[in-house]
């Protein structure tokens, strides 16, 4: 029943984007608040998989002007995916960094990784990497991309099979 509720919620988010009824309520937000929210939201799942989550965060970083609810959802989804696709007793790094006039929030796992031929497709609605055994709707990354792009940001993956994946969300500041 939790899974059905999760899929229904994802479909609702997707329909808001597709119908042009995605409303943003931006406010000044510290990137660490988004990271902390994602960690708290995924705490039980991380404990169940015995995943170690490490946080990397600089002393000084520019605040973001974003809809914190939508971007917290994105970061939470990325961390949830990292936990689910990592091996048990896995290690995950979540953090933020400033590069020139941009702030990046990233989630890095050391799991199976994703073949480069799927790096673009994984952001398509309903796409699932062939052979994936982890349950999912194929909507989380698509919705994440929609939410990030609605803020003028970008999302991309850096991944190599057998070496894990890093998802990077970037906003100009």
Enumerate the predicted regions with their spans.
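Short beta-strand/loop element within the Bergerat-fold HATPase_c
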Residues: 89-101
